[in-house]
Amino acid sequence: MVVAVGLYTDIGKKTRDLLYKDYNTHQKFCLTTSSPNGVAITAAGTRKNESIFGELHTQIKNKKLTVDVKANSESDLLTTITVDEFGTPGLKSIINLVVPDQRSGKLEFQYLHEYAGVNASVGLNSNPMVNLSGAFGSKALSVGVDVSFDTATSDFTKYNAALSLTSPDLIASLHLNNHGDTLVASYYHLVKNHSGTAVGAELSHSMSRNESTLIFGSQHSLDPHTTIKTRFNNYGMASALVQHEWRPKSFVTISGDVDTKAIEKSTKVGLSLVLKH
C-alpha cells in the first residue's frame, strides 16, 4: 500500500527538519550497538551548561512487535510496546508506560491509508486525556485537524488545523494553533536534488500578542557525506551547522548560535557525536 498523506505531524515536517533538526548548543554523545537478532542498545549523554543528563535505551524487535525501554538519570523509566499491522494492514497499536509517573501512560492507535492518516490516544488513568488527530487528502493536497479533550474538566485543551500543498520540489503548509491564536505559514523548496540544496522559511504570528517571527533556512551537501545548514530570524539570531557522516549512520555535528546584535556576548557552540555499530 502506498501512503500518500501520512499523519497530522507530517504536515510541515520537511520545513521543521530544515530549520530546527540537529541544531544544538550543548554537548551530546550517543553510542548504539545492535545484534542480528533484533536487539539494539543505545547509551546517550548530554551536557547542557553545568547539568549532565544520561539515558539508556534498549530496543527489541521480533517480526511485528517492538519493545522499547528507556531509563534516564532522573530515575524515569519509559516502556513502549508497538505492534505493527494490528489486526489489519496499516493499523499500529502503541502502549506507553512511565514509572514512577504512571498517570502519564497512554494507549495509542495509528492508522495509515492511501488517502488518510489517523492517530488516536487515551491516557491510562481515571480521568484521561483523549487526543485525536488526522490528515486527509492526496499527495498534492491534504488537510488535518488535531484535538485534545480533558475528561477531568470536560474541556478541549487543544484544537489545531493545518493545510498542506505539495509538488515534486515545493511544499507549502499553513497551521492554525493554540486555539486559533497562532498562525504558522511555512514552505520548503528543493533547489537541486543531486546536491540536496534546499531553502525554507517559517512565519509565525501570535494574534493575542501581535508578534511575528520569521525564520529563513538553507542546507547544502558539500559531498555525499557532509552537509551544511544555516538559518536566520528577524530578531538577529543566526545559526549554522556542519554534519559529517564519517561511517554509515555515524555522525559528528558542530553547530553554533550567535546574536548578531551582541556577537561578543552571545556566541554558543554545540557538539554532537553519534556512533552506530
From Swiss-Prot:
PROSITE patterns: EUKARYOTIC_PORIN. The keyword tRNA processing does not apply. The keyword Ion transport applies. One of its GO terms (molecular function) is porin activity. Pfam families: Porin_3. It is found in: Plastid outer membrane. Keywords: Ion transport, Membrane, Plastid, Plastid outer membrane, Porin, Transmembrane, Transmembrane beta strand, Transport. GO terms for cellular component: mitochondrial membrane; mitochondrial outer membrane; plastid outer membrane; pore complex. Consists mainly of membrane-spanning sided beta-sheets. Belongs to the eukaryotic mitochondrial porin (TC 1.B.8.1) family. This is Outer plastidial membrane protein porin. The gene is POR1.
